[in-house]
Amino acid sequence: MRDYKVVVLGAGGVGKSSITVQFVQGVYVESYDPTIEDSYRKQIEVDGRACDLEILDTAGVAQFTAMRELYIKSGKGFLLVYSVTDENSLKELLALREQVLRIKDSDNVPMVLVGNKCDLEDDRVLSIEDGVKVSQDWGLVPFYETSAMYKTNVDEAFIDVVRQIMRKEAAISAEKKQQKELQKQQQQQQQEQDAEGQQQQQKSGKSKSSATQKDATADGQTDVNARLKQSINDHPKSSSGSKFCTII
């Protein structure tokens, strides 16, 4: 079973705790109590794989922003939540997303954009199109309008971010495997080149040895011929025509 840490981010009062508790416990929490930090765990199955989720429900108020960076560092996936009844809550997400990308030092971070409180149609100030536009501006980040009260798209939003985490891990694993195979091939090629070089050196050594032996034989024969010639010069032909040849 794989462990995944999901961080829920957003302005205060947008319903981060409500959708988290609804997802984990199946209960709607109506009262608003500003959260410092709550941690929840839930085991789910995504695409046939068992996952143990740790969900961090973070504070939305300004005095807890220092803690937020720690949550972002440890998180693998993020739900960025705004309220469709609060235009400023969507604007705050722009800065939050930039903070996530900066801390994670990546443009490829598992992330879902969530427009909560879609059941409050009479209080709505942000349309679905507003959320879609932000999603497009962020590179087609998955976007869901949710209702914590009616559990509309709550499970879908969490499962989506988990699925993104799984895909990213699979891609990283495949890349590492490919790099390992490439290194193995390079090592084999280097070993083959080294072996070929040694064979060439051995052949070159044998050729030099053979040439040296030939040179030594030729030098020996030259020396014998020189001695023979000297001996003939030292003992000229006799009057009877006999030859005296002394080979030393």
UniProtKB/Swiss-Prot annotation:
Protein name: Ras-related protein RSR1
Control of this protein's activity: Alternates between an inactive form bound to GDP and an active form bound to GTP. Activated by a guanine nucleotide-exchange factor (GEF) and inactivated by a GTPase-activating protein (GAP).
Residues bearing a lipid moiety (S-geranylgeranyl cysteine): 245
Low complexity composition-biased segments: 184-214
Assigned keywords, A-Z: Cell membrane, GTP-binding, Hydrolase, Lipoprotein, Membrane, Methylation, Nucleotide-binding, Prenylation
Root EC class: hydrolase
Organism for this UniProt entry: Candida albicans
UniProt-listed NCBIfam families: small_GTP
Pfam families for the chain: Ras
Extent of Polar residues compositional bias: 219-231, 238-248
Species classification: Eukaryota, Fungi, Dikarya, Ascomycota, Saccharomycotina
Subcellular location: Cell membrane
Modified residues (Cysteine methyl ester): 245
Catalytic activity: GTP + H2O = GDP + phosphate + H(+)
One Gene Ontology CC term in the entry: vacuolar membrane
EC number: 3.6.5.2
